[in-house]
Every structure is written in structure tokens, then in C-alpha cells.
Amino acid sequence: MKLNFKTRIALNYFVATGVVVALVFAVVYISLKTTIYESLDSDLNYESEIHLEELNLTQMVFSNREEWEEREHEEVEVNPVFVQILNAKHEITDKSPNLNEDRLQFFSQQEDNIHFNTTLNNRLIRQVQKPVKIDGVLKGYIITAMSFEASQKIIDQLLLILLISYPTV
């Protein structure tokens, strides 16, 4: 089928516009997702460093637990931070009061200091496992996690909006 000149120009314009809009939508989605992940990862790193300073490295427990618990009770937290301490044998030696009877899962196959998504009580969390070393000897791990559900809902909603609005643009 041979198309006339005007039809070919219109078709090329239509396809080019569709590709450009798709690229813009992809950039918006990827930018937002990356920003959310970087923000959560930054918060997790900060919390890990703070709690690492409060750690009794010989016993792998929080050094001043009473003060730590008081601070946790005084703060109103929208995104609570979960902290768990493991010894070198991956046994729990201490954990934050907000974990109650729950525990954060240790993933031995996961690389150290890499942030990843997992679940706690069937709820989405973002977690990082950092080794605790003294003079190069592994003493244990500090696991820090935060809820990721609200952030994931935002990412999912944006994707849905972009997919629905793409055909109309």
C-alpha cells in the first residue's frame, strides 16, 4: 500500500510524538523511583551509623538501652526504624523495642551494605545489613529497616497514572 506524502508525514509525526512522550514518561517514572530509593537508603545509612555508635561492641548489645528506649518513646515517628543486632553466629543479641516479638530476617547470601526490599509481617520494608568489625574481625551485624509501603504505593500510583494517560496524550 502506497501512502501519499501528507499521510506519511502525519504518520511519522504521530509515531515520533508517541516515542517522545513515552521517553518523557519513562524519565519521570525512573527519576521519582530513584529519588525515593536514594532517600530511604540515605535514612537507613544514617540510622545504622547512629545506632552503631550506641553499640557495646564486645557484647553486641546497645550500651545505654534505657536512654535509647526513652528516646524512642518520646519521638513521634511516621516511619519507624527497626534495628536488630546479631553476633557473628547470626544470633540476635539485641533489637529495638518497636520490633516487639518480631525479628528482621538476616540474608546470608545478600552482600553487605546493599539496600534491598523484603517483608516484615507481610509488610514491605527496605533493609540494609552492615557488618560490625573490630580490627578487621567480624563481631556481628547491625540490621536496619524502614517501612517501604507508602513509598511503593506512590511509585505504583505514578506508574498507573502514566500508563493510563499515555494513550490519551
Name the predicted role of every residue range.
Residues 15-20, 160, 164-168:
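Hydrophobic alpha-helical transmembrane segments of multipass membrane transporters and ion channels
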Residues 1-82, 88-89, 148-156:
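Juxtamembrane segments flanking the first transmembrane helix
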Residues 91, 97-163:
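Extracytoplasmic
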